[in-house]
Regions:
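Short acidic (Asp/Glu) and glycine-rich catalytic loops that position anionic groups and cofactors
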Residues: 1-3, 103
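Non-catalytic DNA-recognition/assembly elements of restriction-modification systems
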Residues: 4-31, 57
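Proline/glycine-anchored alpha-helix kink/cap motifs
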Residues: 14, 159-160
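DNA target-recognition domains and sequence-specific DNA-contacting regions of bacterial/archaeal
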Residues: 23-159
Length: 160
């Protein structure tokens, strides 16, 4: 039995409240600090995730292949630990649970559980439920120079 059908089976016959993704999570897009500014990349200690991290090290990650320095962080705000990165452009739907404060490139949208829901959800359940979100993302893409997810629909995706 696949992980997804097991999760769906667990909810069979159970009353649950379904909430839109944007109500449960703070959503932020990733970005790539300028490669021309050497100080952004020299002696960095902040994990900066790319698709290669998932491909090479799996879906639950506590370290990245590349690091950036604190001066590369826009507004001084990192994505929080125990948040989920999901690819919303190019390689649609790939996702990972990140267990440390971090940043990621622009292909990812970060899903950070809102504090008001911290006691309501288990982040690992949400991570596994993101396999359903990933499937939805692959079916709801727009094409321009590269594939990207319908972000209006993405924000409305329902979470049990």
């Amino acid at each position: 039995m696949s992980e997804l059908s097991y999760l769906e089976k667990l909810m069979d016959g159970v009353e649950v409240e379904w909430l839109p993704l944007s109500k449960v999570f703070n959503l932020r897009n990733g970005y790539t600090p300028s490669k021309t500014k050497k100080e952004f990349w020299a002696n960095g200690d902040i994990p900066w995730f790319r698709m290669d991290d998932i491909r090479e090290n799996g879906r639950i990650l506590g370290n990245s292949l590349q690091k950036i320095s604190s001066c590369a962080v826009k507004g001084g705000k990192l994505f929080p630990e125990n948040s989920i990165l999901i690819s919303t452009s190019a390689t649609i739907g790939e996702h990972a649970l990140i267990t440390v404060p971090h940043l990621a490139n622009q292909r990812f949208t970060c899903l950070a559980l809102k504090e008001s829901y911290a006691d309501c959800f288990d982040i690992k359940f949400l991570f596994y439920y993101c396999f359903s979100l990933a499937e939805w993302c692959r079916k709801n893409t727009t094409m321009s120079s590269f594939a990207s997810v319908d972000m209006d629909g993405f924000k409305k995706f329902l979470i049990p």
